[in-house]
């Protein structure tokens, strides 16, 4: 006869899973964050800054995974259970009402520079720059050279002779190099809460999706809107945003057509009469004076009088423009001397 032995689960673990499940169910946005490399003082500072916007709880990875799966089952939400695939390192549960993109931005803004530790993987290329270290001659000169940093004594101080990448992104930083970088005051990493994944409304977001260049995104949206507007306007597509401009364009075109074809309407009668009068006066100006009556002569005279000041103004404008060009040319010539 087979005897089944029921595994004993510590009561505190059961309570912890229950607490984590309550946290997961309490907010629409659930994130898994990594806080392994965050020193205790900085972690406390971050907690204090974001306390009003998020709820954060550290726990064992196995308990977080169990809580996610049980909560997903109870909520009949299999997508939520997929968050368990992202639990690693020093994971913690974070819940909030903020959307994933705002959450990512909040956590990034609350990161602070820190020295790299020996054994850590470089998150980026780490470079030392040419120049004085401000340190007097001594054993540190040998330490710099031992990790491949070209250094010498210049003006009584240890100086780095050239810019150099001492470790590339993805490489492990040796303890010796980490100590040298720390003495140089180089803090190449930012420590804080790193998002591993965020769940909202049936979608899981990863950091590569959440990392958005806001200025570029806004410029792209504005360009897309302008292009869509132009396309709709030029194809006469009656979108809500374009319709007032299409109506205005149609009115202007219809009015111009009406005037051109002498089709009289309430709106165009005045323009058609003005055009006809202008054409009549233009024709009359070609005739000899004896063929014209006094009324036509008076009208022609008034046209000539009103045209004269306009011509004078045009000449004056051309003269000013010419003088401005000469000034600009002179200024450009002087600029070449300097």
From Swiss-Prot:
SUPFAM superfamilies: Ribosomal protein L10-like. The keyword Ribonucleoprotein applies. One of its GO terms (cellular component) is cytosolic large ribosomal subunit. One of its GO terms (molecular function) is structural constituent of ribosome. InterPro entries: Ribosomal_protein_uL10, Ribosomal_uL10, Ribosomal_uL10-like_insert, Ribosomal_uL10-like_insert_sf, Ribosomal_uL10-like_sf, Ribosomal_uL10_arc. The keyword Cell membrane does not apply. One of its GO terms (biological process) is cytoplasmic translation. It comes from the Archaea. Pfam families: Ribosomal_L10, RL10P_insert. CDD domains: Ribosomal_P0_L10e. Residues 317-328 have a biased composition (Basic and acidic residues). NCBIfam families: PRK04019.1-2, PRK04019.1-5. Forms part of the ribosomal stalk, playing a central role in the interaction of the ribosome with GTP-bound translation factors. This is Large ribosomal subunit protein uL10. It comes from Methanocaldococcus jannaschii (strain ATCC 43067 / DSM 2661 / JAL-1 / JCM 10045 / NBRC 100440). The lineage of its organism: Archaea, Methanobacteriati, Methanobacteriota, Methanomada group, Methanococci. The gene is rpl10.
């Amino acid at each position: 006869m087979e005897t089944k032995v029921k595994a004993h689960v510590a009561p505190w673990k059961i309570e912890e899973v229950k607490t984590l499940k309550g946290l997961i169910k309490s907010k629409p946005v659930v994130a898994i964050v990594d806080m392994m490399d965050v020193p205790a003082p900085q972690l406390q500072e971050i907690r204090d800054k974001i306390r009003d916007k998020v709820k954060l709880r550290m726990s064992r990875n196995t308990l977080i995974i169990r809580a996610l799966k049980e909560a997903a089952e109870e909520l009949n939400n299999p997508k939520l259970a997929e968050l368990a695939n992202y639990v690693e390192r020093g994971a913690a549960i974070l819940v909030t009402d903020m959307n994933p993109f705002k959450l990512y931005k909040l956590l990034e803004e609350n990161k602070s520079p820190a020295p790299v530790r020996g054994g850590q993987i470089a998150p980026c290329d780490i470079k030392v720059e040419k120049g004085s270290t401000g340190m007097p001659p001594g054993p540190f000169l040998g330490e710099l050279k031992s990790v491949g940093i070209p250094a010498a004594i210049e003006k009584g101080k240890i100086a780095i002779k050239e810019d150099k990448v001492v470790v590339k992104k993805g490489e492990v930083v040796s303890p010796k190099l980490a100590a040298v970088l720390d003495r140089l005051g180089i803090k190449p990493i930012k420590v804080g809460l790193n998002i591993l994944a965020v769940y909202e409304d049936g979608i899981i977001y990863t950091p590569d999706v959440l990392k958005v260049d806001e200025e570029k995104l806004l410029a792209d949206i504005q360009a897309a809107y302008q292009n869509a507007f132009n396309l709709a306007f030029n194809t006469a597509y009656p979108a809500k945003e374009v319709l007032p401009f299409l109506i205005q364009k149609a009115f202007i075109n219809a009015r111009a057509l009406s005037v051109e074809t002498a089709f009289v309407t309430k709106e165009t009668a005045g323009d058609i009469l003005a055009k006809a009068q202008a054409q009549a006066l233009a024709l009359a100006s070609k005739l000899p004076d004896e063929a014209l009556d006094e009324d036509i002569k008076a009208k022609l005279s008034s046209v000539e009088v009103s045209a004269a000041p306009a011509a004078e103004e045009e000449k004056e404008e051309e003269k000013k423009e010419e003088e401005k060009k000469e000034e600009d040319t002179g200024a450009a010539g002087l600029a070449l001397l300097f």
